[in-house]
Amino acid sequence: TDETPPAADVLIAQLLAKIDARGHGHREIVFEPGRSLVGNAGVLLTEVMFLKPGEQKNFCVVDAAMNDLMRPALYEAFMGIVNTRRREGATEVWDVVGPVCESGDWLGRDRQLSVQPGDVLAVLSAGAYGMTMASNYNTRGRAAEVMVDGSQAWVIREREVPADLFKHEHLLPN
């Protein structure tokens, strides 16, 4: 399916046309347009840890996982994935998967890529719901968030470390 968020003006025009076609005079529409506003504003960067070529499938194992970006696992959402390093030569078909031992831990299936361990892949259109749907599954800290404006960048949320995951827990008294 096409996962490109619709332009707001196009979406509103289509909604109003449907409402008008049903004969509703006064109309008020309230909706939460999160993905259409910020979907394309975010990119998840992930490093290729190792490659597992196989007879039937090739797996490109990266350091990001379903806990970092849940949309592919939860909705089978298509996310564009590109290598940030231009590589010459042939590409191969890879499933881009995370290191969490779950069958749903994938970011992209059947992707034509030229990749090597150490490459950084960009998972595109990851701006909506990335952090709000992120979890600490398998004791994985959530990723850092970086705001980029032109040639400037600021860390706006630090990467979680293991101590962050346990700081709100308390032992029971003896």
Each model region followed by its residue ranges:
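Active-site-proximal beta-alpha loop/turn segments in soluble metabolic enzymes
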Residues: T1-A7, G34-L37
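C-terminal helical cap(s) of enzyme catalytic domains, especially alpha/beta-barrels
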Residues: E3-I12, T139-V146
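Alpha-helix-loop-beta-strand connector modules within alpha/beta enzyme cores
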Residues: L11-G23
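Charged (often Lys/Glu-rich) extended helix/loop segments that serve as interaction or gating elements
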Residues: G25-N174
